[in-house]
Every structure is written in structure tokens, then in C-alpha cells.
């Protein structure tokens, strides 16, 4: 039987299929495809608004207390276009789609997936919940403490995912090998070195998990808040300290406790915060997340930060540690949009699979019977609800 030439659509669909199966972080977060660009095409800088859930307060007693519905949303910018460029021959196009996928598309999609996934994993810097186990190997209790943080923040008790760095995966498989597990999990642990589903999470090993280096502040509380009025909001006025605080560093503020998200009752636990912009020792202000909210429907702490309250950084001075990430699907969003389809080229297609849009464009080099080809994805990502994620700081 004669070979049939591969079509642009077939090649694009196969490339998307391979790409999708290699994205084990992006594949588990909220993926949104913005179809508004399907005709004219999107470009870098195009934006998508994502509405967040409304929050309300509860009245006690018979007297009505009407409250406004305040809609909040996050804007995600399609800020990154990445692609892989290659050249193939007419003979390559006569291959079966399986052979073409193995020889050409598989290695292309591996490197593209790694770069896209690495970008998206930088969202760990937005996460302020952290199980601090710096300098030690992960234990089963470490994982359960992370699950507790998510459940306490109303992430739910089912459908939770966890991406492990490779060393933490080793430590956890070793910890769990002697415990009771169902036969399927035992097979994964012994034969594949994988955890599967246990401890309330579905686990995925990921070689792209980042490492975090903390600032030079030693975490002894030498940074103090500096304002006569209890501070709220996303910027703290502080006295100068003795070391640096880097983006992604976790800290607590003396006397500022976390409240239950619905009842607003004091949990008795210090609220964790994350530094959103790196600062030097001479800084007198600090950008933080979450924003301190002491009243109303979005209240997240018992009170604002009183004057001279100590900031205690987690993790020690200039410490380099592994990061693993537990989360509910709605914590993060990854958005793609259709790129413009060019005219007058030999070979072009654009396809969408499970929220990911990809474009392939190929021209023809008549002198050499070659097809210079580009594969592109335009995307953006953002942490939407950081309270539904937690970091594990190990090793």
C-alpha cells in the first residue's frame, strides 16, 4: 500500500498529544483556552480575565445587614511565546504518523514541554503556605502536614496533587515501603520508584522542580514593623534589618494569626507570608502576599501588624533547599490562545487539546526539497488562589 503524506492537522494533533502527556504540573492545574483569538490570532500581551469566587459575611440576629457583592478577578497576560524550529524532508512526510512522532516530534516536544513547565513552576514563589523541613529528608508526616494546610484553607480533601522533586520522591518511597499499601501502589513503589496515590495526594515526580535559596537574613526576628497604626495591605513598613529577604522567602509576623476562611475564628496559628519582591538590608518597606486583611468578607488574619512586631523568616540564612508543591487544581491557571495563521505558506495548522493551543507552520525550500518548520505555543500563567497550594521545603 502506498504511503500517504502527513497532513498539517495530523502532525499538529500528534505534537499536541505528545506535549500534553509530558506536562505533569500544567496537566493538573486549571487550563483555560481563550477562543476569542481564534479568527484574528493572539499576540504577546493579549490578556484574559479570570473571575474569582465571591466571599460574604454572615449576619447574627433578625435585623437585615445587606452587603454588596464585590466581584474580583485576576488578569492573565499571554506574555510568553516559545517554540521549536526544525527542518524535515519530503521523505520524512511520507512516514507513518507513529514513525514521524517517534523520530521527529518526540524529541521536539520533550524540550518544548520542559521549558514551558519550568516557566510555570516558577509560580511556587507566589505560595505562602510552607511545611518547613529544611535540612532534613521528607517523611510521611511532612506530607500530612502539607495536606492539613490545604484542608484548613478549604482546598477539599480529594483531588489534591503533589509534584515532588526527585530526591523527595526517593525519600518518600523509602519511607513508605514498609507501610501498608494496596497492591497497585506497592507495584509502583518497588518496580517504578513511584508513589502513586497516598496520604491524600496523587503524586508526580518532576525533574524540573525548582530549588529555592533564602535571603541572608538569619530568621531571628531582627526585622521589625515600623508604624504606629496596625498595618494591613500588601506592603509593610519596616525597620532596617541585618540581612536580605529574597522573593519567595517565607516569614511570619508576631501576633498576626490566621483565621478560619469562613467563620473568621482565630486558629491560634501564625499566618505565613511570602516576600514578593527581593529587598536589601537597608530596605524600609516590604512587599508581601497574602495582603493583610483584618476585617470583612476577605479577612484572613486576626489583626493588622502592630508596631515593632518581629518578622521571622523561615529556613535560615542563605539556605538552598528543594521545593515540592502540593495543590488543588484551582490554585494555578495556565492559559493559551490561538496564534495568527499565516497565509501563503505550504503547510500550516492550529489545534487545541485540553486547553492547550499549538500552531505549526512550514514553508518549502524548493532548492533543497526541505520544509523549514516552526512549532509555537503562546501562553500565560498565574497563581489565582495561593491559599490552595503549599510548598514542601526539604533537604
Q: What are these regions, as identified by a protein language model?
A:
Residues 1-74, 389:
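N-terminal "assembly arms/tails" that initiate or stabilize quaternary assembly
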Residues 37-39, 147-154, 190-194, 242, ...:
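A generic local secondary-structure boundary/capping motif
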Residues 50, 76-142, 151-168, 191-205, ...:
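Long, contiguous amphipathic alpha-helices that act as assembly "spine/axial" helices in icosahedral shell
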Residues 54, 90, 209, 294, ...:
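Beta-strand elements of well-folded, non-transmembrane domains
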Residues 97-99, 237-241, 360-367:
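Exposed beta-sheet edge/beta-hairpin loop segments within beta-rich domains
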Residues 171-291, 391-392:
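Autoprocessing Asn-cyclization modules and mimics
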Residues 277-337:
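Glycine- and charge-enriched low-complexity intrinsically disordered segments
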Residues 358-395:
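Hydrophobic, glycine-enriched assembly/anchoring segments
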Amino acid at each position: 500500500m502506498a504511503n500517504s503524506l502527513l497532513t498539517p492537522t495530523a502532525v499538529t494533533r500528534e505534537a499536541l498529544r505528545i506535549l500534553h502527556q509530558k506536562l505533569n504540573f500544567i496537566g493538573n492545574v486549571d487550563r483555560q483556552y481563550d477562543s476569542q483569538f481564534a479568527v484574528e490570532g493572539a499576540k504577546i500581551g493579549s490578556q484574559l480575565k479570570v473571575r474569582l469566587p465571591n466571599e460574604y459575611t454572615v449576619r447574627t440576629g433578625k435585623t437585615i445587614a445587606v452587603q454588596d457583592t464585590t466581584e474580583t478577578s485576576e488578569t492573565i497576560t499571554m506574555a510568553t511565546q516559545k517554540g521549536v524550529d526544525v527542518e524535515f524532508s519530503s521523505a520524512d512526510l511520507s512516514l507513518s504518523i507513529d514513525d514521524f512522532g517517534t523520530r521527529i516530534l518526540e524529541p521536539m516536544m520533550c524540550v518544548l514541554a520542559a521549558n514551558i513547565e519550568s516557566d510555570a513552576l516558577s509560580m511556587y514563589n507566589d505560595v505562602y503556605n510552607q511545611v518547613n523541613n529544611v535540612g532534613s529528608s521528607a517523611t510521611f508526616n511532612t506530607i500530612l502536614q502539607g495536606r492539613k494546610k490545604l484542608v484548613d484553607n478549604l482546598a477539599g480533601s480529594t483531588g489534591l496533587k503533589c509534584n515532588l522533586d526527585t530526591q523527595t520522591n526517593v525519600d518518600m518511597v523509602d519511607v513508605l515501603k514498609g507501610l501498608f499499601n494496596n497492591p497497585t501502589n506497592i507495584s509502583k513503589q518497588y518496580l517504578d520508584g513511584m508513589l502513586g496515590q497516598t496520604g491524600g495526594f496523587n503524586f508526580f515526580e518532576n525533574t524540573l522542580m525548582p530549588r529555592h535559596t533564602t535571603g541572608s537574613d538569619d530568621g531571628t526576628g531582627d526585622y521589625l514593623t515600623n508604624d504606629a497604626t496596625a498595618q494591613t495591605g500588601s506592603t509593610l513598613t519596616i525597620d532596617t534589618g541585618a540581612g536580605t529577604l529574597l522573593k519567595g522567602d517565607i516569614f511570619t509576623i508576631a501576633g498576626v494569626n490566621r483565621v478560619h476562611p469562613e467563620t473568621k475564628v482565630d486558629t491560634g496559628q501564625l499566618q505565613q507570608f511570602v516576600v514578593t519582591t527581593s529587598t536589601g538590608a537597608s530596605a524600609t518597606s516590604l512587599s508581601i502576599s497574602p495582603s493583610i486583611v483584618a476585617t470583612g468578607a476577605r479577612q484572613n488574619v486576626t489583626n493588622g501588624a502592630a508596631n515593632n512586631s518581629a518578622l521571622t523568616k523561615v529556613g535560615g540564612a542563605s539556605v538552598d533547599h528543594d521545593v515540592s508543591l502540593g495543590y488543588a487544581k484551582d490554585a494555578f491557571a495556565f492559559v493559551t490562545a490561538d496564534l495568527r495563521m499565516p497565509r501563503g505558506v505550504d503547510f500550516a495548522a492550529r489545534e487545541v487539546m485540553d486547553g492547550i493551543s499549538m500552531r505549526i507552520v512550514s514553508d518549502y525550500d524548493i532548492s533543497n526539497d526541505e520544509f523549514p518548520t516552526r512549532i509555537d505555543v503562546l501562553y500565560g500563567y498565574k497563581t489565582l488562589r495561593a491559599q490552595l497550594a503549599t510548598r514542601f521545603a526539604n533537604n
